[in-house]
């Protein structure tokens, strides 16, 4: 039942993506990006709603052409989450989505074109209070930086980012955040570390093109975890070649593991061995599936035997430890109920939901009293 994180976050300027604060003292937000065809309004709206149900704070949508910009406007009218428009090359697309109510523009000033075009986009953003994300990627560095460094390096990523930052500074625009992404964990981490001490704007963290569900989760957890543990990062996106909903789940799991943000159940479970008194793996799989809808922060321990079971169970809001002839459930650190293996998951789910309801009511009462 640990709730406080020892991490001291890097001070940063606060900006607003719609109603979601990013930077400053705001919670670290979790975002994803749609992988539907933006022209398909129905499919894109459906995916955004699934992301919202999974807990996404912000969603990015690719807007490759003017037809997609018009579709973006229709999408924006049908969803509640703040939307970031991902735009490259054509500044007129940025101007159009600004008119249609976009919450944030993801651009690189360097690929928008002439100074007057960049100024037009910045003026549109300034007039409407729209923040900009400068998104630098190792796979699309400027040609002169590729020539200078020979290959993508942390220094090249940061030089590119600072070039864009200076561009916005010249236009007296400070309402922006920055990312310096690479698919290599060490490169991305080094770039963010270099950049963190040179600007005061919020940092959007990500390991780009991290891979599939398993490999991408591991890379993102390692890379983002290193930075977050150092206090670097104000919003995160886990990039996976998978259902975008999985990105949200992994993002929250990373934050939960560092006690930076709590949402839903934090499971503690043993890997199981021959000492287990019930099927730990099956129990865990069923509980994770059944309890996905719970948003109340709750620690749940599922331990198969008495070696570590009582100790772990006592530290959780709800803890199950295997035993003979019966398993023992702890609630808030105290023995509460014995359960046999028959209907074990059903009974455990009932107890967890009851505890979640009690905790939600208690938390609401604290908010009202304060």
Curated annotation (Swiss-Prot):
Cofactors (names): [4Fe-4S] cluster
Entry's family note: Belongs to the IspG family.
GO molecular function (one): 4 iron, 4 sulfur cluster binding
Note on cofactor: Binds 1 [4Fe-4S] cluster.
InterPro entries to which the protein is assigned, alphabetical: Dihydropteroate_synth-like_sf (IPR011005), IspG_bac (IPR016425), IspG_bac-typ (IPR004588), NO2/SO3_Rdtase_4Fe4S_sf (IPR045854)
EC number: 1.17.7.3
Entry keyword set: 4Fe-4S, Iron, Iron-sulfur, Isoprene biosynthesis, Metal-binding, Oxidoreductase
Gene name linked to the record: ispG
Gene3D superfamilies in the cross-refs: Dihydropteroate synthase-like (3.20.20.20), Sulfite Reductase Hemoprotein, domain 1 (3.30.413.10)
Positions that bind [4Fe-4S] cluster: 270, 273, 305, 312
Protein name: 4-hydroxy-3-methylbut-2-en-1-yl diphosphate synthase (flavodoxin)
Coiled-coil annotated spans: none
GO BP, one annotated term: isopentenyl diphosphate biosynthetic process, methylerythritol 4-phosphate pathway
HAMAP family tied to this protein: IspG
Tree of life domain: Bacteria
Catalytic activity: (2E)-4-hydroxy-3-methylbut-2-enyl diphosphate + oxidized [flavodoxin] + H2O + 2 H(+) = 2-C-methyl-D-erythritol 2,4-cyclic diphosphate + reduced [flavodoxin]
SUPFAM superfamilies documented for this protein: FMN-linked oxidoreductases (SSF51395), Nitrite and sulphite reductase 4Fe-4S domain-like (SSF56014)
UniProt enzyme class: oxidoreductase
Function description: Converts 2C-methyl-D-erythritol 2,4-cyclodiphosphate (ME-2,4cPP) into 1-hydroxy-2-methyl-2-(E)-butenyl 4-diphosphate.
Pfam families (alphabetical): GcpE
TM regions (residue ranges): none
